[in-house]
């Protein structure tokens, strides 16, 4: 896979990995988890290419604040993942034809939002470990958020503790 740069309509630069693009092949777009980047999933992408006999185009974007992307990131001011959804929407719209959207953790939620916002563009959705809450947990989170109580999520704390360097890479 080759590293490329996507420039948004506002001039922000996003780094992404892309396989050898074949016109007319299916498009698979992957969104990584918080604290990760596209490189993390290269083994998965290679297995997908083999499964589809190399007849699939794979795109994996480094989301803002991650990997080699230079787009402005303000993690302290982040209130939702909407900015990542907006970035993803513009990215998939730049790809010719329908896309299969996929992601891991936060990335799977972004993929799901894109599928719901763009049903004519997103043909399939594949989610790995989506961050989903049941109705009661969701209500508790919204109340705590509204009251500004315990704003730190355990899942975010766990993501913040992830290693940034892996000796084998």
List each language-model region with its residue ranges:
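Gly/Ala-rich beta-loop-alpha elbow adjacent to hydrolase catalytic centers
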Residues: 103-107, 111
